[in-house]
Amino acid sequence: MATNWTTEDSKSLVDNYTVLDNVYFAVDGTFSALGILFNTSTIFIILKGRRFGQQIKLQLLNISLIDLICSVILPTTVALNGFTTISYPNNKSLCKAQEYVTFTLFYASLLAKTAIAIEKVVAVCFPLVILKYERTHIISVIALVWVSAILIHVNIAIDSVVLESKYFNDTLVCVPNANLIYAQYLAYQQLAIEYAIKYLTPSFIILISYGVI
């Protein structure tokens, strides 16, 4: 499928939005602002607090930093996808980079929360094991989280194509070549499949872990 690189001036895109579209942008903006506020406050509290152990402090800082960056990137992504005719016109590399960084950060956040949930189960069920859980092990877990998040979405950065989506407007989206079988169902359908495969499994582990506790 060839990408149609249009240079025509767009109409007022906001005029074409439905009420649901405007609600979507409003909700994203609200969550982004709250995310920046709460995660910045959390980082400040963790750094100043003395009641946190070294291990949990590192984990909470890691999650808060990831979520803070996500909160900053979110409004940028929404603005590019909602208020421009085409995101990154004639620049496929930037389109891929934005998509790759966004998905990597979201997945790193989820994996970090999954790691904490598993650690809590181990602490409750195997307390003697957790006593040997030193700082070096925490750093290894954090490194594993980041490496996994970086590698699992590497196909977006390397082996993907840039296609137009009719989601809100003719914004560009990056679709891994392996997923072209459903590329015609861009936006909602593609995201639903990716989230089901990549995100529901860690979420299920978190649910089971806290259920055991």
Task: Show where each model-derived region lies.
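Extracellular N-terminal segment of 7TM GPCRs
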Residues: M1-S41, L180
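Loop architecture of class A 7-transmembrane GPCRs
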Residues: T6-V14, T85-T104, L151-L200
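Extracellular TM2-ECL1-early TM3 structural module of rhodopsin-like
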Residues: Y17-G29, I56-A115, F126, I130
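Hydrophobic alpha-helical transmembrane segments of polytopic
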Residues: Y24, F31, I63, I138-V145
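Generic alpha-helical transmembrane segments of integral inner-membrane proteins
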Residues: A33, L37-T40, V72, A108, ...
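Transmembrane helix-loop junctions and nearby membrane-interface residues
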Residues: I43-I46, P75-T85, V121, H153-E164, ...
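Intracellular signaling interfaces of 7-transmembrane GPCRs
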Residues: K48-L58, V121-V141, G211-I213
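Class A (rhodopsin-like) GPCR signature focused on the TM5-ICL3 interface and adjacent 7TM helical core
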Residues: A112-V124, I156-Y167, I193-I213
